[in-house]
Amino acid sequence: MLAESLIRRELLPEVKISLPKIQTADTLLLKKLRFDIPKIDSFIGLAAADLCCVSGYGANLLLTRLCVRSLLPERYGGLNSPYVMVADASNHTDVYGTVNFARQYGMSKKDVAERILVVRAFTVHQVRRLISVELPKIVQKYQVRSVIVPGLLNAFDEDPIMRIKDIKKEISRITEAINELSARVLVVTSVQQGGRHSDLVLCAFKKRINLLQNEKQGTLKAEIYNQGDSKVVNLTEREFKIIPKT
């Protein structure tokens, strides 16, 4: 989630890369991406081919954290992804947050910037085309193992004239495309809590985290849903922003 130059990266000459190794379903299931937040990791894990939705207060920060962690080697709870794809449907890419997490993990800011590919979409049509047509090509071309989609439904929430029938049809198409993509790579998206159309998609995510501010300042509650099971944990904002020392 760094720099506007990343948006133009897709227009540069194709990078010569080796073909990805064929991964079996068992291999994909064994690989796990950790949030590096023990209270969350103890209840939910993200496989190399998986789908998760984050909503509520601090959702973008959590996606930024996962974006950087996806680049880490597997022995550190990452996916060792050559590149991470950020399909920004809300214009919420967090440059400062990305740099901050890269610094905490001792990673080169330049290396992180070069390995995070950002493409923005602003209209419903652009979002659908990006997710259903462009993302599968980018995933294949750059050996992407992690796709981050901030603000999945923002374009719908900001369109005042789109008919509900058309909204449901487009959301169904986008959800179907995301499900197909998550059979190949990890896809993590965010949906605005209380958004006009959030109820149309939240039920489609078997893995989901909803973040709520507590009355006590500097704390929040995480409602975690994992394939039919659920758990509520209390967290501090510091646990979201600062990685634990090992």
Label the model's feature ranges.
Residues 2-103:
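The Walker A/P-loop phosphate-binding site
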Residues 45-46, 74-79, 108-111, 138-141, ...:
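Conserved catalytic network of the ASCE P-loop NTPase/AAA+ motor domain
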Residues 49-50, 81, 113, 182, ...:
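Short, well-ordered alpha-helix to beta-strand connector turns
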Residues 52, 85-87, 117-119, 186, ...:
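Hydrophobic/aromatic beta-strand patches that form the interior of the parallel beta-sheet core
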Residues 63-68, 128-132, 171-175:
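Short, hydrophobic/amphipathic alpha-helical packing segments
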Residues 82-160:
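Conserved inter-motif catalytic segment of the P-loop NTP-binding fold
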Residues 136-204:
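P-loop NTPase motor core
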Residues 176-246:
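Phosphate-binding/switch region of NTP-binding enzymes
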